[in-house]
């Protein structure tokens, strides 16, 4: 009888433990992890751009001579950017021909990922269609873009910048824009551009690319990387508005302006739940820092392009203030990418020889060209 009671108690205990392990009540005191939305810790691959001012007894005349030498070597009026400014370190012409050889027989596929470009937002300007409809466009200029580094997929998976939700068949390509004098940056930052053989860039960013779309370091990227009537995704940091309340940040209605009570006109009200939902839930719309977050506008159509000045006119609005850096890349929307199957883009990019043969300005078939006659009257 005693052994039967022991077996029954052991069986009952195992059942209770099994039910307790599957029941959510054991997490009744669980606290959600709180973390900062904006981390102050720099990325692990971050290199300091500037260092302390070290003169080492150099006179002002010597500094002027160094600046003049930098200007003559890299920023001459006849050649704004020279690829021979810095000698390539660890990358010869034979290695470029073998490792970064462009496969001319490769055809663009639906899941192919090309590199993007860094542009500067110049503002907005209206355009008109042939039917007379007004369309607001954002003007983006692609200035001095060069490929700085390419990391193959097998090496990119081992890096600290790789995330588990990335595809294992993508590599990393670093693109820089706006060449500057090397006297403005630290030595560690200047060493990042030795492999590409270009002047130090003011802005760097990273794109995920397919192995078939890899480009050699030092390759120049222009606005003709895209085409008119293509759809692109544009991402940038939104305009910062500092600390704002719920009315401006989230669009709360607020209380009555005439019969409000005290200082509760623009307050958020209750922040907690009921009896069973005590405490503030994650994601509650509250007052806080507004703006300065990365935002992406997807599926923007290119209506006009100036190949001479590398200017792109995209339909719609783009996040960020004027004169900010934006990332322009091929769209990820499936219903927009299906149209590229009939007319695929150039992979990995449009070569410099082919870019010189393009017309200076290309407009969409829907836009009206103001150089043409709007009204034609036949003589009677």
Label every model-predicted segment.
Residues 27-380:
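Extended basic (Lys/Arg/His-rich) segments that typically form rRNA-contacting surfaces
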Residues 1-23:
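N-terminal chloroplast transit peptides
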